[in-house]
Amino acid sequence: MTVVCKLGSSIVAAPDGSLREDVLDLVCAQVASLHGGGERVILVTSGAIARGMRLMGMEARPAAIDELQAASAVGQGDLFRSYESRLGADEVRAAQVLLTASDLQIRDHWLNARSTLTRLLDWRVTPVVNENDTTATDEITFGDNDFLAAQVAIMMEARLLVLLTDIAGLHTADPRQDSSAELISEVSDATEIADLEIGDGTSPFGLGGMRSKVAAAGMAGASGIETVICDGTAEGSLRDAVAGESVGTRFTA
């Protein structure tokens, strides 16, 4: 079975746009370990725009679509190489896969994307998926790839979707603003969290917040796929999520 793991901009890029090398080291080491244990892992990454902005010396996220697209074009290759080199050090081959919303809406495109991803997994290659921001339009505001990750999980009939962020999971309030916020370890029914004020806080470079992650978990759950939202900066969090250990917030399906 397949596991889809999504890394948000907040754990890929630091506030100044530099790559969070330590976090990428941590996550890629876990992916390599899972790969060695027979898991089929697909990575979905954000961060191309953030990386491009850093390389181009931009301090603020551009508002113009063409500038966002150009920044993504500058950053995407460098971002992929960051994954490729780390996975390659553990003898795991990586492949870059860029998708747009239309690839997941047009039947022929969807079938081709699924066939390609399936072949890569059969070859024991780890796909590194990102949205093709250079040709996308409205998709650039598509929730920091949370929905893309959910759709890839559905397409590949994954057993688990893991959304890695920079906080421990879904809380009763924003833990960065409320010290009394408590971690919600499991959600089995969306009505359980209907009354929560789920924030849209993001990194300076991303667009996805906890709200989009919860929505992505709901989308995956409707197709029978469990989702775990957890802290990607914590040692072993991805490994524990895949093993079914208590980590972050698990949305049962």
Spell out what each predicted region is:
Residues 1-253:
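C-terminal catalytic "cap/lid" subdomain
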